[in-house]
């Protein structure tokens, strides 16, 4: 069966929108779960406060984007778009994850199946957010420069436009990877700090040795 390439191009943003809807439905389902005891809520709020720090990534991304203007202002904009969508997907995933972890712990008190379902759907939101926002970002750049091709005399041929679009996609990917790199480094440090803190609490307050399997 032959499929028109133009039809496939327009199916990409439609698939992205459907993915956002599914992620929204899963998020709503997870948020309906109870957050457990008051002590669990206190711990969950502390985790949420520390995990939502994205200010440093935004500042560094803007600095790099300014430097990229020397190459091409369009690549700089693509870099910012990539960094924005990467940070947005991380923000959505982190927000749902830190909200679902305490709900997963609360669900485990009632049923292991409910706990597994809560954690699975909470994690699915992160995966969907990454894929969907990547699709929408690349598609947005494609349609933007498709419009410029029809209204800008700088592109003398289809091949010139295609080459420029590839550079923009590279700039978009660089921005997305740049933001994701700092998010991963920050997340690793935060996770290790939480691990060490848990070991200290178990050792000092509960009297459990550091190498004990219970700690």
Task: Tell me what each language-model feature is.
Residues 2-215:
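Hydrophobic, small-residue-rich transmembrane alpha-helices and their short perimembrane loops
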